[in-house]
Regions:
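Conserved glycine-rich Rossmann-like NAD(P)H-binding loop of the short-chain dehydrogenase/reductase
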Residues: 28-44
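Canonical Rossmann dinucleotide-binding motif of NAD(H)/NADP(H)-dependent dehydrogenases/reductases
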Residues: 3-32
Length: 150
């Protein structure tokens, strides 16, 4: 895929792997929508990116929040060509600690962001990507999912 003038939606794009990816993609000529939960960090990331970038505040685990971010991307850039899922959280708790078992609610939050959130973004973005005119290799876009222990 030729990156020049492509639109990339990057979850967790205000820091870490997401921000580093945004820097590489924008250097290759892409337009970037930073999707992040933290508005201050997202603003700062966009100001540091040397190119066409904007941000959308969203919780990847919430359908309406993600749809709003996708709508903002479509309004701003008219398309989505690349989705890069980098949003993720971790829990710094032992499975069994001094106070007993790791709270299950903490683990459910991690799953909501890291698993449900990733699927939520890709399924909603894929709807818009499917509307793209296929390129010479019949490609309408690419979705990249990452995983880590945050």
């Amino acid at each position: 895929m030729d990156i020049k003038n492509k639109v990339a939606l990057i979850t967790g794009g205000a820091s870490g792997l997401g921000f580093a990816s945004a820097q590489k993609l924008i250097a290759a000529g892409a337009k970037i929508m930073v999707m992040d939960l933290n508005e201050d960090n997202a603003k700062k990331a966009c100001s540091e990116l040397n190119g066409e970038a904007d941000y959308a505040i969203a919780n990847v685990a919430e359908e309406a929040s993600v749809q709003d971010a996708i709508n903002k991307t479509m309004d701003k850039f008219g398309r989505i060509d690349i989705v890069l899922n980098c949003a993720g959280i971790g829990s710094a708790s032992k499975t069994v600690g001094k106070d007993g078992a790791h709270p299950l609610d903490y683990f459910k939050i991690v799953l909501d962001v890291n698993l449900v959130g990733t699927f939520n973004v890709l399924r909603l973005a894929a709807v818009e990507m499917g509307k793209n005119e296929p390129e010479k290799d019949n490609e309408c876009g690419v979705i990249i999912n990452t995983a880590s222990v945050a």
